[in-house]
């Protein structure tokens, strides 16, 4: 699958909460494996995950690729929303 098809794709948690959209990926260049996806959070997800909404811009989290359950018309995660509370913000 081309990254261009994933870029901007909606991301939904296992409990059907709209988490956000894919905004990037991280690749281990030694093994040529995708290790993380970057998700730009929705305003609702920012609130539910207890992040502080910035005045400008958005919050992106770096989600380990193992959290992805399926990819179709949208990305389905293998965790409920509350299972994402310890995922760090991408810097």
PLM regions: where:
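Peripheral interaction segments used for macromolecular assembly
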Residues: 1-91
């Amino acid at each position: 699958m081309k990254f261009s098809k994933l870029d901007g794709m909606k991301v939904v948690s296992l409990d059907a909460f709209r988490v956000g959209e894919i905004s990037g990926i991280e690749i281990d260049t030694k093994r040529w494996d995708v290790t993380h996806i970057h998700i730009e959070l929705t305003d609702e997800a920012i609130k539910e995950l207890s992040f502080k909404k910035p005045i400008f811009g958005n919050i992106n989290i770096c989600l380990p690729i193992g959290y992805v359950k399926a990819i179709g018309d949208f990305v389905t995660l293998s965790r409920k929303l509350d299972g994402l509370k310890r995922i760090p913000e991408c810097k």
